[in-house]
Amino acid sequence: MITELHGIDIRENEPLKHYTYTKVGGPADFLAFPRNHYELSRIVAYANKENMPWLVLGNASNLIVRDGGIRGFVIMFDKLNAVHLNGYTLEAEAGANLIETTKIAKFHSLTGFEFACGIPGSIGGAVFMNAGAYGGEISHIFLSAKVLTPSGEIKTISARDMAFGYRHSAIQETGDIVISAKFALKPGNYDTISQEMNRLNHLRQLKQPLEFPSCGSVFKRPPGHFAGQLIMEANLKGHRIGGVEVSEKHAGFMINVADGTAKDYEDLIAYVIETVENHSGVRLEPEVRIIGENL
C-alpha cells in the first residue's frame, strides 16, 4: 500500500492478462483505477516524484502486453467513463466504452459515430489510434481533447494539432494521454442510424472472429493491398505458434485459442511479416501496439 495515494484503487503485482482483449500479459507493479482527474493527477505526481515510470492502458484492445509485465504504474480509465451531450457535441471521458458511446449517440438520434459501433476499446484509445472502420474514422468527427502531458499538466489539443493520419495521431509521439474528447455529430433519424449500425455489426460478425480473444486487426492496410488478403495468399490461414493462430475466418486477425502467450503473438507476427514479404514483396506493418518486458 502506498500511503500517499490512500483512497485510490491501486492493486499491486496485478496480472494484466485479466484486463487485455488478448488475455495475455504479465503483472503490473501497480495497477491504478482513478475515479476522477484529481486522483489521476495524484498518481502521476507521485510517480514523477519517485521517478517511477507510468503509462495508461486504455481498454487494452489493440494492444499486446508482454509476458514480463510492466514496471511502475499502469493506469486504467475504466472509472473515468462519463459521456455528456451539449447540443450536437458529444463529450466523453477517455475510459468511456467506444461501442456504448455510439449507442448513446444513436439514442439521441445523432449521426456520425455509426462507423465505430462495433470497434472494441475506449474513447481515449480510439483517439490515440484514430480508430476507424467501413470508411469512417475518429478524425472525421473529432473537435478537441483534454490531455495529460508526461509532466502532469492538463491542456487542450485541437483537431489541427492532433495531426491525424491513418491509424496515427500526434500524441503517439508526444506521450500526451487523452483524458476526454469532444466530437461534432449531426442530427439524424433514429431508425436510419439504427439500421446502419445493425448492418455494420452484421458485417463484423460475418467476417471477424469475435468468439475468440484477439487484439483486433493486427496489421495496417498496406497501400494498394489488404493485409488479410496477402496473408491468405501466403497460405497462412490457420497457421499456429503456441496457443495463437491466424484466424481461419479473417486472416488479418490472430486469435488466442489455447492459453497463448505474448511471445506466441510476437513470434507469429514476425513469422507472418517474413512469410508475406517473401511471397508478395510487401512488408506488413503492425497496427497493434506491443509494450512491456519479456520474461
UniProtKB/Swiss-Prot annotation:
The active site is at residues 167, 217, 287. Signal peptide: none annotated. Pfam families: FAD_binding_4, MurB_C. One of its GO terms (biological process) is peptidoglycan biosynthetic process. PANTHER family: UDP-N-ACETYLENOLPYRUVOYLGLUCOSAMINE REDUCTASE. Cell wall formation. This is UDP-N-acetylenolpyruvoylglucosamine reductase. It comes from Streptococcus pyogenes serotype M18 (strain MGAS8232). The gene is murB.
